[in-house]
Design a protein with these regions (language model features):
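Left-handed beta-helix
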Residues: 9, 14-15, 20-21, 26-35, ...
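C-terminal segments of enzyme domains that contribute to small-molecule binding surfaces
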Residues: 61-73, 104-131
């Protein structure tokens, strides 16, 4: 199945990538995600995402994060929970929780309405998951 999906949808997500509950991809998507990457719960990703590393140092994406189209996330960065990354951003440094960031390189623009673009949130119970 991995092979069929990756060729048809132009999706390359390593089987070693850790992905949380409620992961959502919209539109016609094309993405490349490195195997060291950790993706939290309720992460919404738009088309043409690239998460890469040359040194196997993971990018860590928190919970309830929206990532806009044409975003590149480079190397060892952490994107905080409830954050939004604007279209075309190149993330080279950590983004704090509850932030909206955009630009090349990505910079925090504000802390208003964190995570507002995350729709269809999966409701999970951490205690039940541990059992």
């Amino acid at each position: 199945m991995y092979e069929r999906v990756s060729k048809k949808a132009q999706v390359q997500i390593s089987p070693f990538t850790k992905i949380g509950y409620g992961f959502y991809t919209g539109h016609n998507i094309c993405m490349i995600v490195n195997g060291a990457t950790v993706i939290g719960n309720n992460v919404n990703i738009s088309q043409f995402l690239n998460i890469g590393t040359n040194h196997n140092t993971p990018a860590i994406i928190g919970d309830n994060v929206y990532i806009g189209p044409h975003v590149s996330i480079v190397e060892n960065v952490k994107i905080g929970s409830n954050s939004s990354i604007g279209a075309g951003a190149v993330v080279t440094k950590d983004i704090p929780d509850n932030a909206t960031a955009a630009g090349v390189p990505a910079q925090v623009l504000n802390y208003n309405n964190p995570g507002r673009y995350v729709g269809n949130r999966y409701k999970y119970n951490h205690e039940k998951l541990r059992q």
